[in-house]
């Protein structure tokens, strides 16, 4: 006996035996998936889980915007729910209070990283950011990286008139951008700002890490930094290849580019580190790389830990710092420029504030930040509304624990939905509306309580180590640019602000930007 099925409009004959066998396999797999759960201690319960397909789980449900889909599911199932990608269970956290409870108050329980395939490709599996290690070695290296980053960014430079290294580097790059934008207006009359912002932001972190900047036409440098989209696509939460092993062996252009990018970036940094070793002088520390070499030669990270820093680990730490200070800042500035040209009223108000506080005789400085609350409110609203980091890098539990009465076993993969927090109607009035004024109090100052509810850099022990620098850098770039020029797009051009999902969500490139010099 044969039964006719239609697939993509084509009739396919299937025997009754084959149908019976397929049904039996389907039922068996479904039973295994549903029953393969850890034993839940008395008094606790398992997180609720929507229905999903056997073997596939919720891959098809997540679609192209998993942050939005999971936010919708949280409204039905609560702040703690479980999905499956393939057959792998994944805990999804939503809600500001729940996420703070997990990452801050129970930070030791949730500070791990899952051992995902894509993570093993970053720095040959030795990345401080993506490596599953969360023990004392990881903690010591993180402290070392934070101290080195602070020493060559927010610390003062005795040889400069700027307040700190970061201010000096950003001011130089902002000056270059202004000159470039004017040059482009004299030529083609329009431009894509991302093409130039990405290099200037990369040059700031290069100056901090390597003590040098690169020309905007350096092809090797451009080929690396312009592949950040591919990096974000692969390392984003929910990449099926991390959970369904067979997908790693199927043709995957993005995955191939990701592997190539990591290999080339490692070689790029390795070459710079070798050059630093050749010219290293103890007592004359030029940048972060020199600082790490000095620690390496001292053969310890701190006085209480017998942990050595190998030459290879220097490369990995520098790569992590580059990532922490590059892609997030570039994306933040890029989104900011889009909001400025689509909200001319907001842009004008920022420039009026800049003129009132700073005047026209000098450029903005980091010390001006407390006196520019509307610009700060604009940056906060850009972070919130775009939520361009929709999820943190996935976490994992380091031991059996419970959250909100739900049992969470050790080693569980955890997605933290930052987008949901930033668009939660319980926290924000009209969350879909772009309105910087929401962050200002009646006396015109920044509402500190509300500003702390915007989550974009993670929380707790895995919080982005470059957060403080990133916030300062975004502020100073925007302050200088808006002080000097007015941004707009070619008349009649409609700006596409549709987010493109990834570790950091980009937008479609716009080649119709224009600037007008402010008098």
UniProtKB/Swiss-Prot annotation:
Signal peptide extent: none
Cofactor dependency: heme
Known function: A cytochrome P450 monooxygenase involved in the metabolism of various endogenous substrates, including fatty acids, steroid hormones and vitamins. Mechanistically, uses molecular oxygen inserting one oxygen atom into a substrate, and reducing the second into a water molecule, with two electrons provided by NADPH via cytochrome P450 reductase (CPR; NADPH-ferrihemoprotein reductase). Catalyzes the hydroxylation of carbon-hydrogen bonds.
UniProt protein name: Cytochrome P450 1A1
Species assigned in the record: Ovis aries
UniProt topology in membrane: Peripheral membrane protein
GO molecular function, one term: steroid 17-alpha-monooxygenase activity
Entry binding sites for substrate: 231
Induction: By oxygen; in lung.
UniProt region (Mitochondrial targeting signal), positions on chain: 36-47
UniProt keywords, alphabetically: Cytoplasm, Endoplasmic reticulum, Glycoprotein, Heme, Iron, Lipid biosynthesis, Lipid metabolism, Lyase, Membrane, Metal-binding, Microsome, Mitochondrion, Mitochondrion inner membrane, Monooxygenase, Oxidoreductase, Steroid biosynthesis
Further facts: Increased expression of this enzyme in lung due to oxygen exposure has been related to hyperoxic injury in microvascular endothelium.
């Amino acid at each position: 006996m044969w039964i006719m099925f239609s697939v993509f409009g084509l009739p396919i004959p299937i025997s009754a035996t084959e149908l019976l066998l397929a049904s039996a396999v389907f039922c068996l797999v479904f039973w295994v998936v549903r029953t393969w759960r850890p034993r839940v201690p008395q008094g606790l319960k398992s997180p609720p889980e929507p229905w999903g397909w056997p073997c596939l789980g919720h891959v098809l449900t997540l679609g192209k915007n998993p942050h939005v889909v999971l936010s919708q599911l949280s409204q039905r199932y609560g702040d703690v729910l479980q999905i499956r990608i393939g057959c792998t269970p994944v805990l999804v956290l939503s809600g500001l209070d729940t996420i703070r409870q997990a990452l801050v108050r129970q930070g030791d329980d949730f500070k791990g990283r899952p051992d995902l395939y894509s993570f093993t490709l970053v720095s040959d599996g030795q990345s401080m950011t993506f490596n599953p290690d969360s023990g004392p070695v990881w903690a010591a290296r993180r402290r070392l990286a934070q101290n080195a980053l602070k020493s060559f960014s927010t610390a003062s430079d005795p040889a400069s008139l700027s307040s700190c290294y970061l201010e000096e580097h950003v001011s130089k790059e902002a000056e270059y951008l202004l000159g470039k934008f004017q040059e482009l207006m004299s030529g083609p009359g329009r431009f894509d700002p991302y093409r130039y912002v990405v290099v200037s932001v990369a040059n700031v972190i290069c100056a901090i890490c390597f003590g040098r900047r690169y020309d905007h036409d350096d092809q090797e440098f451009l080929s690396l930094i312009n592949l950040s989209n591919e990096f974000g696509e692969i390392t984003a939460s929910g990449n099926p290849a991390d959970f369904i092993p067979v997908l790693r062996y199927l043709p995957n252009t993005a995955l191939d580019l990701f592997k190539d990018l990591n290999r080339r970036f490692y070689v790029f940094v390795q070459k710079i580190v070798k050059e630093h070793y050749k010219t290293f002088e103890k007592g004359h520390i030029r940048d972060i790389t020199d600082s790490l070499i000095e620690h390496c030669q001292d053969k310890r990270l701190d006085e209480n830990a017998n942990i050595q820093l190998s030459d290879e680990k220097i490369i990995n730490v520098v790569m992590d710092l580059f990532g922490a200070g590059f892609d997030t800042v570039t994306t933040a500035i890029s989104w900011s420029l889009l909001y400025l040209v689509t909200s001319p009223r907001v842009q004008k108000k920022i420039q009026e504030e800049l003129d009132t506080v700073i005047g026209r005789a000098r450029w903005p400085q980091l010390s001006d930040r407390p006196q520019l609350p509307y610009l700060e409110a604009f940056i906060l609203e850009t972070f919130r509304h775009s939520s361009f980091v929709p999820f943190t890098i996935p976490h994992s539990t380091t031991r059996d624990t419970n959250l909100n009465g739900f049992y969470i076993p050790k080693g569980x993969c955890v997605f933290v939905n930052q987008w949901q927090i930033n668009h939660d109607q319980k926290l924000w009035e009209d969350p879909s509306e772009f309105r910087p004024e929401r962050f200002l109090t009646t006396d015109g100052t920044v509402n500190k309580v509300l500003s702390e509810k915007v989550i974009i850099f993670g929380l707790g022990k895995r919080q982005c180590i470059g957060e403080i620098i990133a916030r300062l850098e975004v502020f100073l770039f925007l302050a200088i640019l808006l002080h000097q020029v007015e941004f707009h797009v070619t008349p009649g051009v409609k700006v596409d602000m549709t987010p493109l999902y990834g570790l950091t969500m980009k937008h479609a490139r716009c080649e119709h930007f224009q600037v007008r010099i402010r008098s």
